[in-house]
Amino acid sequence: MSDSQREQRKNEHVEIAMSQKDALVSDFDKVRFVHHSIPSIDVSQVDMTSHTTKFDLAYPIYINAMTGGSDWTKQINEKLAIVARETGIAMAVGSTHAALRNPNMIETFSIVRKTNPKGTIFSNVGADVPVDKALQAVELLDAQALQIHVNSPQELVMPEGNREFASWMSNIESIVKRVDVPVIIKEVGFGMSKETLQALYDIGVNYVDVSGRGGTNFVDIENERRSNKDMNYLSQWGQSTVESLLESTEFQDRLNIFASGGLRTPLDAVKCLALGAKAIGMSRPFLNQVEQSGITNTVDYVESFIQHMKKIMTMLDAPNIERLRQADIVMSPELISWINQRGLHLNRK
């Protein structure tokens, strides 16, 4: 594939992603908090700091991996970097493969660090990238962490996608051993199982983003790019974010669990934290906001989102993220069935 074709693909991904709509039915609606009438804390007492093994986040919310690799996506990355800088949230860039292949594309990613020199930034590569390229991806952004995206369904639906996955796990292990910053294994909207989490833990992974079904749908995106659009039947493939968090329960004391995929509201975000996530990522909401409403309105959106999360945590009598795990929750019969059929053991504190 030529560089111009790759650039076109990057733009197509963004265009199709922006046109996607939120799911009408979400597993977040199948999780409910029990309301207790009299909190013992004030909103001002809520501390939203997220403590992970290797770094802390001022807020448990970050702009998740989206884009880079074309002139248009450079502009998007710059806008999002301003939003991250002004609000104090972390930001991940999209796959840096374009920049690792073509030096002319480096600035479409490095603009993020240039715009936000003191911010927390995650770089991003695929699971098949050589170790030396993974090191370059970190250096490119002076990144605090490296996301490795695992996206086999997307690759298999993508007309020009990868068809070879046998080396992914061993390659991830090599990168984890060589890269000095934390490595976050990131799904792209298909969720993770307890078996995947066990396998990743066994090779030394400390961070995962379970990124479940319900948000940006890369099967649909790649199917739109197919000449006969013949793989739409896979559009609901994978686990939802809620199901993935339930799958992660027994690993939450051993792994730093991040969650993304289909979050619509501050309430959805708080539910993720209550189910064991240490931070939550969002992509399309930020993309749509910054492209349709501009930087200032997106900053306002983020600040409002954070304040709403604080208010919900106050209602739940949770002065910090750790205490959220003690919040009383009721789940739907469908989720209880998932728990039982999968043999999951919920050790909510």
Curated annotation (Swiss-Prot):
GO CC terms: cytoplasm
Binding site for FMN: A65, M66, T67, S95, N124, K186, S211, T216, G262, L263, R264, S283, R284
EC number(s) from the headed UniProt entry: 5.3.3.2
Major localization listed first in the record, in broad terms: cytoplasm
Binding of Mg(2+), residues: E155
MF annotations from Gene Ontology: FMN binding; isopentenyl-diphosphate delta-isomerase activity; magnesium ion binding; NADPH binding; oxidoreductase activity
Subcellular location: Cytoplasm
Protein's name according to its UniProt entry: Isopentenyl-diphosphate delta-isomerase
Taxonomic source organism: Staphylococcus epidermidis (strain ATCC 35984 / DSM 28319 / BCRC 17069 / CCUG 31568 / BM 3577 / RP62A)
Taxon lineage: Bacteria, Bacillati, Bacillota, Bacilli, Bacillales
